[in-house]
UniProtKB/Swiss-Prot annotation:
GO terms for biological process: cellular response to xenobiotic stimulus; centrosome cycle; mitotic cell cycle; negative regulation of catalytic activity; neuron projection morphogenesis; positive regulation of transcription by RNA polymerase II; protein dephosphorylation; regulation of cell adhesion. PANTHER family: PROTEIN PHOSPHATASE 1 REGULATORY SUBUNIT 12, PROTEIN PHOSPHATASE 1 REGULATORY SUBUNIT 12A. Its main location: cytoplasm. Residues 290-553, 588-928 are annotated as: Disordered. The gene is Ppp1r12a. One of its GO terms (cellular component) is cytoplasm. It comes from Rattus norvegicus (Rat). Residues 683-866 are annotated as: Interaction with ROCK2. Residues 302-316, 400-421, 540-551, 602-612, 798-812 have a biased composition (Polar residues). Residues 291-300, 318-340, 422-432, 481-491, 614-625, 674-683, 719-768, 816-842, 869-885, 916-928 have a biased composition (Basic and acidic residues). This is Protein phosphatase 1 regulatory subunit 12A.
Length: 1032
């Protein structure tokens, strides 16, 4: 039964399993591919830092915020100023970047340029309206942090020119906070707005900056002395952290809770500056006395005030009055208890007053900057989050403008909205001192709260804050902020508070630390700089200013601030995935933000970037292709058939520009027509010989042209002499010679036209070299050949190859020598008979190849001195050849153009040369007989000279090469020697180290050996004693 039950249960389990969720799960867990997406702003900042203006433009067109700030509050303009990228600075300013945008520590781009010493950027920024009186969270203007004299001079001149009051700018924050605190006190209602990110209040700012007057007024107005920010810091935490003794005393006198802990579990003692720890302990003792006295008196009013909240309108006044009285009594008791401490305090106050006069001035402007910044933050975040809560008409939109422009009547510098601003807005300003801790940066946690919640709180407070305060009473919160900031500034030096990151990073000496802590180190989010706000109002930059906060002088910023400071851009970036639309895809794709549809943007990015790169490469290739094409044109390999040569050329350079193919097509037209009587086998043999004797990359140089012309002259003179001797020997054939001459003269008339084509044919012989040129069967029209020849010559002359004309000259000389050969051949043919003349002429024409000169490796030999001189002349320089050339030309009454004009006059020269060469043997051979010997001697001497010069040049070149090689060899040897020495030293050191280790091992063995020796000695002594005993 039990077995049956078990089986039944098992079957039921199996049935339940089938179709269950677990059964339906796939056996292999599918892992989703992680896709990395970057925020639009991060992509924009990266593009700006890389200097890619095209990419930046595309991002801007796609809706990127040009004033986007990273977690440190740094915008692209800040980064460009730090990187000394003048072009990007100009580009960003031209595209609407806020030139006075502060970062988390109140540094505007001008601060960055001044601290780095970039004069050109500073001049440009000033010219574009940068505020030279801008004060950062430490109370420093660009002039204060300028590194170089030239920069200081520039900024000082600009300050003088604009009439900026630096001291007033520094005190602006405290003055505004005082005004608002008085206004709250008079109105009986505190309408402070917490800072959007830190949750700081005006009381925090006043305590941290040491604005004692503001602090007193705020407490009188009914501020809760134990109010906490988002990180749980009370005003006492701030005052203790920044070392503000007076602020601590005021808070303790007003019975703040000294044991309150923040969210990290730290009391004010834990985060306090080391310098005031003792003072805080004394204050705690006094407060305990006060508490005991009050417990004795059982004063309910004081107890109620201790827990009083900000928004109690009626009770606040009653309790406030008693509060004012009680603290004074308590203060008198405390002072009576410690007169010594009072004296010290007074001295400290004097010191602080001297310092804090400056510090307060700095902090005023800083806290103003904080209020202004934080208020815009709230309003901006409201705008960004599209919160449609209906605030009072005076409160809703004016928050930005009023926050920026509330300087009221006392502020004469900023004539914008003064007393007209609604009290709610002004109070909000003062409340924005909540930003007090933007600069304080205690723990990274304070930046965690979203700006949206802060903005909602701000709006709620705006809606609830209905009390209108008179413009005459300045805000309390501003003065509070100043004092709080002083306290916070001092706290920077606290090194032992582990979880808190000291706000001030660069304290040097104690005095500096005190001053800086009191005024400068507090990085307030410039919620109180109304002056800044008005300037920024004018530049429509309130949003960005609201989002940024100040930092210490260094540009290194903390990341917890970074997280909270940047205003998130809510624009979703549409991505284009198709690679076709290059610009659009570029605009959309490069920055794949978290808001883009997943998967689409990466593809768009790749395609767009690849398109752009492809376009750039193609343009570069187009630039380079023209010379490439020309180069290929000059010396293609010699192909046997005309058609195959053109096709091969076009196919090999298919990737280059179409112009190259066009030129190749043109070249097809200059190829010498194949004669009918020449068989295919003969043509192949000729092309094969041409390929053997010529390098595929060989060109034609000017030197070769000149050599060819001299060679023509020499070969012509030798041939004329031989022909004259033959005529003398064969007088019986003079009639036939005359007939032949007459035929030649008749053909000369037609040749005058054909010689214009002659050069083009000789040029093309560089590609089909050994194919004999039939002047009569040339079918190419002279005009077309001339035009194509001109273009081809131009293309070849553009080449960079030094020997680009070798083929032309050799072919040129070969063409002229062929004419002379033909004349001699025809005379010989006349001897043998006219019936055999045609085939014999072909053979004869083919045989005198040994007299022709190839441009490549010459493979024929002859014993005559003339041909040897011709071979020597291949290496001669161009200068003396020019002389011989002009001589030989002028001898034939042709226009003697210098060889330097060869490129211009080459076409005409070729025709005149060949024509004169043709006529010379027939017309004036006998007349020139006497002069040819002298010419030959002269040419021989010139050839020798040129040969010697060439040899000298070659030897000089070899000498320089050898010297270079020698130097390289010596350097190599030295390096090798050094290396060998080093290696030898290393080997020796290793050997010594081994030796030392061996010796150490031996030393370790030495005690053992000594012990063994001692033992053996003892044994020997014992044995000796035993033996002596036995011997007895």
């Amino acid at each position: 039964m039990k077995m049956a039950d078990a089986k039944q249960k098992r079957n039921e389990q199996l049935k339940r399993w089938i179709g269950s969720e677990t059964d339906l799960e796939p056996p292999v867990v599918k892992r989703q591919k992680t896709k990395v997406k970057f925020d639009d702003g991060a992509v924009f900042l990266a593009a700006c830092s890389s200097g890619d203006t095209d990419e930046v433009l595309k991002l801007l067109h796609r809706g990127a915020d040009i004033n986007y700030a990273n977690v440190d509050g740094l915008t692209a303009l800040h980064q460009a100023c730090i990187d000394d990228n003048v072009d990007m600075v100009k580009f960003l300013v031209e595209n609407g970047a806020n030139i006075n945008q502060p970062d988390n520590e109140g540094w505007i781009p001008l601060h960055a340029a001044a601290s780095c010493g970039y004069l050109d950027i500073a001049e440009f920024l000033i010219g574009q309206g940068a505020h030279v009186g801008a004060v950062n969270s430490e109370g420093d203007t660009p002039l204060d942090i300028a590194e170089e004299e030239a920069m200081e001079e520039l900024l000082q001149n600009e300050v003088n020119r604009q009439g900026v009051d630096i001291e007033a700018a520094r005190k602006e924050e405290e003055r505004i906070m005082l005004r608002d605190a008085r206004q709250w006190l008079n109105s009986g209602h505190i309408s402070d707005v917490r800072h959007a990110k830190s949750g700081g209040t005006a009381l925090h700012v006043a305590a941290a900056k040491g604005y004692t007057e503001v602090l007193k007024l705020l407490i009188q107005a009914g501020y809760d002395v134990n109010i906490k920010d988002y990180d749980g810091w009370t005003p006492l935490h701030a005052a203790a952290h920044w070392g503000k003794e007076e602020a601590c005393r005021i808070l303790v006198d007003n019975l703040c809770d000294m044991e309150t802990v923040n969210k990290v579990g730290q009391t004010a003692f834990d985060v306090a500056d080391e310098d005031i720890l003792g003072y805080l302990e004394e204050l705690q003792k006094k407060q305990n006395l006060l508490h005991s006295e009050k417990r004795d008196k059982k004063s309910p009013l004081i107890e109620s005030t201790a827990n009083m909240e900000n928004n109690q309108p009626q009770k606040t006044f009653k309790n406030k009055e008693t509060l004012i009285i009680e603290p004074e009594k308590n203060a008198s008791r405390i002072e009576s208890l410690e007169q010594e401490k009072a004296d010290e305090e007074e001295e400290g106050k004097k010191d602080e007053s001297s310092c804090s006069s400056e510090e307060d001035e700095e902090d005023d402007s800083e806290s103003e900057a904080e209020t202004d910044k934080t208020k815009p933050m709230a309003s901006v975040t409201n705008a960004h989050t599209a919160s449609t809560q209906a605030a009072p008409a005076a409160v809703t939109t004016p928050t930005l403008s009023s926050n920026q422009g509330t300087p009221t009547s006392p502020v004469k510098k900023f004539p914008t909205s003064t007393t007209k601003i609604s009290p709610k807005e002004e109070e909000r300003k003062d409340e924005s001192p909540a930003s007090w801790r933007l600069g304080l940066r205690k723990t990274g946690s304070y930046g965690a709260l979203a700006e949206i919640t802060a903005s909602k709180e701000a709006q709620k407070e705006k809606d609830t804050a209905g009390v209108i305060r008179s413009a005459s009473s300045p805000r309390l919160s501003s003065s509070l902020d100043n004092k709080e900031k002083e306290k916070d500034n001092k706290g920077t030096r606290l090194a032992y508070v582990a979880p808190t990151i000291p706000r001030r990073l660069g304290s040097t000496s104690d005095i500096e630390e005190k001053e800086n802590r009191e005024s400068s180190n507090l990085r307030t989010s410039s919620s109180y700089t109304r002056r800044k706000w008005e300037d920024d109002l004018k530049k429509n930059s309130s949003i960005n200013e609201g989002s940024t906060y100040h930092r210490s002088c260094s540009f290194g910023r903390r990341q917890d601030d970074l997280i909270s400071c940047s205003v998130p851009s809510t624009t979703s970036t549409p991505t284009v995935t198709s690679a076709a639309g290059l610009q659009k895809s570029f605009l959309s794709s490069t920055s794949t933000t978290a808001k883009t549809p997943p998967g689409s943007s990466p593809a768009g990015t790749q395609s767009s970037t690849s398109n752009r790169l492809w376009a750039e490469d193609s343009t570069e290739k187009e630039k380079d292709s023209a010379p490439t094409a020309a180069t290929i044109l000059v010396a293609p390999t010699v192909v046997s058939a005309a058609a195959s040569s053109t096709t091969a050329l076009t196919t090999t350079t298919a990737g280059t520009l179409s112009s190259t193919s066009e030129v190749r097509e043109r070249r097809r037209s200059y190829l010498t027509p194949v004669r009918d009587e020449e068989s295919e086998s003969q043509r192949k043999a000729r092309s094969r010989q041409a390929r053997q004797s010529r390098r595929s990359t060989q060109g034609v140089t000017l030197t070769d042209l000149q050599e060819a012309e001299k060679t023509i002259g020499r070969s012509r003179s030798t041939r004329t002499r031989e022909q004259e001797n033959e005529e003398k020997d064969k007088e019986e054939k003079e009639k036939q010679d005359k007939e032949k001459q007459e035929e030649k003269k008749e053909s000369e008339v037609s040749r005058e036209d054909e010689y214009k084509q002659k050069y083009s044919r000789t040029y093309d012989e560089t590609y089909a070299r050994y194919r004999p040129v039939s002047t009569s069967s040339s079918s190419t029209p002279s005009s077309s050949s001339l035009s194509t020849l001109g273009s081809s010559l131009y293309a070849s002359s553009q080449l960079n190859r030094p020997n680009s004309l070798v083929g032309i000259t050799s072919a040129y000389s070969r063409g002229l020598t062929k004419d002379n050969e033909r004349e001699g051949e025809k005379k010989e043919e006349e001897k043998e008979g006219e019936d055999k003349s045609q085939p014999k002429s072909i053979r004869e024409r083919r045989r005198p190849r040994e007299k022709r000169r190839s441009t490549g490796v010459s493979f024929w030999t002859q014993d005559s001195d003339e041909n040897e001189q011709e071979r020597q002349s291949d290496t001669e320089d161009g200068s003396s050849k020019r002389d011989t050339q002009t001589d030989s030309v002028s001898r034939y009454d042709s226009s003697s153009t210098s060889s330097s004009d060869r490129y211009d006059s080459l076409l005409g020269r070729s025709a005149s040369y060949s024509y004169l060469e043709e006529r010379k043997p027939y017309g004036s051979r006998l007349e020139k007989d006497d002069s040819t010997d002298f010419k030959k001697l002269y040419e021989q001497i010139l050839a020798e000279n040129e040969k010697l010069k060439a040899q000298l040049h070659d030897t000089n070149m070899e000498l320089t090469d050898l010297k270079l090689q020698l130097e390289k060899a010596t350097q190599r040897q030295e390096r090798f020697a050094d290396r060998s020495l080093l290696e030898m030293e290393k080997r020796e050191r290793r050997a010594l180290e081994r030796r030392i280790s061996e010796m150490e091992e031996e030393l370790k063995m030495l005690p053992d050996l000594k012990a063994d020796n001692q033992r053996l000695k003892d044994e020997n002594g014992a044995l000796i004693r035993v033996i002596s005993k036995l011997s007895k």
